[in-house]
Amino acid sequence: MKKIILLMMIFLAGCQNIDNEIDNELKVLDNSDSEELTFILELNTKNNSPEDVEEFTKYLSDFIVQREPSSVYGYYISEDGNKVTLIERYNNSQDGIQHGIDFINGPNFDKFFEIFEIEKFIILGYATDEFKQFTKENGFEIEYRESIGGYVRR
């Protein structure tokens, strides 16, 4: 009986330590204090087949994951296959600029615009003036939205 009680005490102490470790690892940061940027692009598939769109987005996702600092990168297609939403998240404006430089100068720029037309481009988070200038100089029409509440948990 003493062994069972001792084992239960050790188990419970271990569970408490795990909870404390999780609490210590995850930090909550107000959105307004975060440098993260989230890109939301609403894309038209320009009458390309859903199969061609999916093949290209899978290829591009594999290409990006090997080269980019984005922490989120995903394509989502509508039921009719005519619209795609692209969501990207970057640690800061500089990472977003680097992505833009790599995209514009990379091997997939022309193919992207053969497959897609950008209908709406929204940036969530605090974008620096340097980021805004870069996107403007490169012809991107962007709707910027800054945080008015919320948090990021890391």
Give the positions of each predicted feature.
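A short gly/proline-enriched turn/hairpin at secondary-structure junctions
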Residues: 87-88, 111
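Sec-dependent N-terminal signal peptides
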Residues: 4-12
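Short S/T/G/P-rich N-terminal loop/turn motif that feeds into the first structured element of a domain
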Residues: 15-84, 91-101, 115-154
